[in-house]
UniProtKB/Swiss-Prot annotation:
GO BP annotation list: diaminopimelate biosynthetic process; lysine biosynthetic process via diaminopimelate
Keywords: Acyltransferase, Amino-acid biosynthesis, Cytoplasm, Diaminopimelate biosynthesis, Lysine biosynthesis, Repeat, Transferase
SUPFAM superfamilies in the cross-refs: Trimeric LpxA-like enzymes (SSF51161)
Protein name per Swiss-Prot or TrEMBL: 2,3,4,5-tetrahydropyridine-2,6-dicarboxylate N-succinyltransferase
Subcellular location: Cytoplasm
Organismal lineage: Bacteria, Pseudomonadati, Pseudomonadota, Betaproteobacteria, Burkholderiales
Gene, per the UniProt record: dapD
Gene Ontology molecular function, alphabetical: 2,3,4,5-tetrahydropyridine-2,6-dicarboxylate N-succinyltransferase activity; nucleotidyltransferase activity
GO CC field: cytoplasm
UniProt key word Acyltransferase: yes
Subunit record text: Homotrimer.
Amino acid sequence: MTQQLEQIIDQAWENRADFSPKNAPADLRNAVAQVIAQLNEGTLRVAQKDSGAWVVNQWVKKAVLLSFRLEDNIAMPSGEYMQFYDKVPTKFANYTAEDFAKGGFRVVPPAVARHGSFIGKNVVMMPSFVNIGAYVDEGSMVDAWATVGSCAQIGKNVHLSGGVGIGGVLEPMQANPTIIEDNCFIGARSEIVEGVIVEENSVISMGVYIGQSTKIYDRATGEVTYGRIPAGSVVVSGNLPSADGKYSLYCAVIVKRVDAKTRAKTGINELLRD
């Protein structure tokens, strides 16, 4: 079944400009709906780790993007005083108390997750936003006003502090999702975007911005890399001088590395102190 869905989605993607809510064929509508439903249940993911490396299911991401071409905006009542007008229903629109109990997570008003996102057990959603295609694994905290972008992958026991932004793949369109691995801490108002991978047990300080063009400077080695924070890194914001010494440009600085045992025993503030 998955192979058949993939084939339908890939073929439709090549002609995506031709589709609209009025002319989309039934088999395409059904295929996209099945993919979104599986994303919603967590049985299908945009990306997963295989033998230590992240593998992106590009066809699943295409299905998410196609879904926007196949649906019209509709009015979505939400309580007595609020309404929305969108193509994607909210994840919890039809949830009962039993559904929430079975899910095993907390949703603090007015948190919003879109249909097609997955929320794992023991996740706490403070007033925040989780977009379609995103996967938030068990035990994680999405703190107040944090946003988890479309198709982003959040690992187990991750803390996304207040106002954190995890970039999506839809606007602007990106090749790969942003990934935060297990047991990471992302400090308040930090932004991780453009398919950057933060590997497990890392700590990102408050106000650190990392995209694919951001220089990541390792203080211990002097090496500059892009797009990936190594496992167990403690990262703060910094600057690197230009070659002519006339100006400096923003960078992210790896100030130290810690193993999982140290990470578990040491407080966040202590790790961030130099």
